[in-house]
Every structure is written in C-alpha cells, then in structure tokens.
Amino acid sequence: MTNGYIGSYTKKNGKGIYRFELNENQSRIDLLEIGFELEASTYLVRNNEVLYGINKEGEQCGVASLKIDDNGELHLLNKCLSSKAGTGCYVSISEDKRYLFEAVYGAGIIRMYELNTHTGEIIRLIQELAHDFPTGTHERQDHPHAHYINQTPDGKYVAVTDLGADRIVTYKFDDNGFEFYKESLFKDSDGTRHIEFHDNGKFAYVVHELSNTVSVAEYNDGKFEELERHLTIPENFDGDTKLAAVRLSHDQQFLYVSNRGHDSIAIFKVLDNGQHLELVTITESGGQFPRDFNIASSDDLLVCAHEQGDSVVTVFERSKETGKITLCDNTRVASEGVCVIF
C-alpha cells in the first residue's frame, strides 16, 4: 500500500490535506480521508517523514510542518505564519533540507524559510522578496505572479517562474536570503507556470499556462534557452482552457501535462536524452479541471485530482512501453483538490 496526500483549497468544501492509500496491486484507491484540516493548503512537499503545506489563519500567511507517522497519519509540528502579503501556491525544499521555498502567486513574491534539519520544524522566515519585472499583455498579467520555485539541478540556484512576466528568474541563496542572478524570457502572454527538469540536469520542460504550450529548454548555469515548443491541446480546440501540471515518468521516458478546461492529460515521448518531445496522445482526465496529478514510484499508476465539478480523484494504469494511460473504474472525491504527492 502506498500513502499519498492531496492538498486543497478551503473556499467551499475543501478540508486542507487529504490522505489516501493507493493499492497498486489492484490499481485503485482503497481509502481517501481527511488527513489534516489546514486552511488554504493548496500545495504540499514531502521530506521523508515530514510534510510541509501552505497555510493561512485570517490575514496571517505562511507554511506549516506536519509529522507523518508509521500509518501515514499526520500530526502538526509547527506553523510559521509571518506574512500578510498573501497565500502561497507552491512550496519546495532545498537539497540539503535546510530551507523551504514558497511562491506567492497573487502578490508576486517569493519566501524562504529556515528549517530544523533534525526535527523538520520551521524555524523562521528568512526573507520575503517581491518581483518587479515588466509584465505581459494578457489580461491576467496585470502584475508579476510568481508561480513556482525550486532548486536547480546543479544545486547553485533556485528557479522561479513568473506567470505575469513570462520569464524564469534564477537566484543565488544562502542564510541571508535571495540574490538575483539571471533571467530567461519567453513569449509575450505565455504565462510561464511550472518547470520539470530531466534527471540529466541539461534539459527542462517549461509549461506556459496561458499559451497552453510546453517548451523544451536547455539549462546551463542559471539560464534557460528554448529549443522547441509544443501545444498541449488539439490545434482545433477553441474553448476556454489553461495548462496546469507537468510531470516526468520516473524512468524519464514520457512527459505528462494536464489541461484545465479541455480536461485532459497530454502525453509526450521524451527523445534524444531529453532534448526533444513528440506528442503521443491526449487523454481525457476523467473529471473537471485537472489541477494536479502524480505518478506512483513504480511508474505503473497515475493519480489525478480535479478542482471543480465533483472534485473526483481518478486513477489511471500506465504503460511503461507506450506511456499511454487507461482510466480505472475507481474514483474518489477530494473537494477542491489541487495538489497530489506521494
């Protein structure tokens, strides 16, 4: 049995963090329940037996740490709600487990926290830094919108996507916080959202929410150079849709991207050691607004959370040979689910 967690909005019926048990032998979710009620816990990241989630209480915003016990159940360690500037949308951990990074979409800021490497507790907010970059012309690009922050494969920097400014910004970081290093620009109105790095560290897959495209970019010393790009929806689709999540299979052979509105998952074959992509197929996600999904470590199953409609959580069997996914007859509900991790 594999334990997984789903983060959610808490605007309507969402409860914060859901816990589920994935039965990989039977290709189904045997249990899905409230793991821990945590307001606005829309993104999660795991460090072994500690789970970190976005959190807010009233006007105070920040992050929370939770202990995962032997049964997969969650117990609060502590919270660090040191800002009133807005609720985050993405969190990640540095390779040395000393820092927690947070991106705040609405306010266009990034935050950096110090962690206790022994207990996993959050010690303090080190810095809160606002983006101040020229923005694109799309109506949603009224100001900078930091959407993703994570350490680069070389370990030297953090890369931050800015949906409002159509770019990736890299920063050096240490105990004093962030220091601007480089920026990489994409097309106007792309709405640069998330990055998935190939294991070789040379290539990155950059997804753009507003243009519904994925770029293959060469990564070198904090800089991203676009090599090619692909649509993630059919060319003839003219409905309202926006790209969401991106994940590589663990064997690095296939890339998956979800589309909210078209309600699908696009599957690409990874070619030439990560340098090129080739569209395999686009598959219905089985629900409305597939905000996030993840692939089990076995590479056999994919679990997708849907933010809207009935907020179903769908399970797909996955072919390691073709990359294609097949919807299983097993759905659960995680209200307002927007993040899936194992």
From Swiss-Prot:
GO terms for molecular function: 6-phosphogluconolactonase activity. Gene3D superfamilies: YVTN repeat-like/Quinoprotein amine dehydrogenase. One of its GO terms (cellular component) is cytosol. It comes from the Bacteria. Belongs to the cycloisomerase 2 family. This is Uncharacterized protein SA1737.
